[in-house]
Amino acid sequence: MVQRFVAFDVETPNHENNRICSVGVTVIDDGCIVRHFSSLVNPGTYFDAFNMQLCGIRPQDTQHAPGFAALWEEIGPLFCGGAILAAHNAPFDLSVLSKCLAAYRIVTPRTVPYICTCRLARKYRPDFPNHRLDTVCRMLSIPLDHHKAGSDSRACAEVLCALLRDGASIEQNLRRYDLLNGKTLPHKVTL
C-alpha cells in the first residue's frame, strides 16, 4: 500500500489568519515527490502591511486569482482522500484551512490525520540551533524561498522525507485535526 503525504503551506493576507492569499501543495508517495502545485488565491478581504511585507503578496497580485472555493475543487481531494497532511507548524496552517472551509461553508471530513515537521525536527534533530523552517532547511541543505507557499510546501515535503530516512517514526508522531472545530485532538492516531 502506498503511503501518501500531502505537504502544504498557506500564506495569509492579514493578522486575522482566516483567509488564504497563497497555497502550496506537494504530494509524496512512498517517499517520492510526485506532484507539486502552488497558486495565488483571491482572499476576498484586506491585506495588512505586515503580511504583505512577510510574504510579498499584495492585493493587486491576487486580483485575478481564483477564490478559495474554486481552488478547493482542485486541491480538496488531495486533502480529504486519506493522505496524511504535513506542514511545518501544522496547527497554524490547519487552523487557517479550517477557518477558510467554514467561511465558504465547504463540507469536508471532520477530522484529518497530520504530522508536523517542526515537531518532528525538534524531536529527531535536537542538535539544530532552532527548528524554524528556514533553519531546518539550511541544516539539511534543502533549497527554500521562505514565505512563498509553493517553496515552503516543497521544503516541508523534503524535510519530512529527510527525517523519515533518518528514522523518524510516523506512528509515534501522528495527530488528528478537527477541521470542524479548528483544533488538534488530544490523542495520538494509529495507522
Predicted regions and their residues:
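Acidic two-metal-ion nuclease catalytic site recognized across multiple nuclease folds
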Residues: 1, 159-191
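Short, glycine/acidic-enriched loop or turn micro-motifs at the edges of active sites
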Residues: 12-14, 119, 155
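Beta-strand segments within the central parallel beta-sheet cores of soluble alpha/beta enzyme folds
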Residues: 113-116, 174-176
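Short, flexible loop segments at boundaries between secondary-structure elements
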Residues: 115-126
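Acidic, divalent-metal-coordinating active-site segment for phosphoryl/phosphodiester hydrolysis
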Residues: 148-162
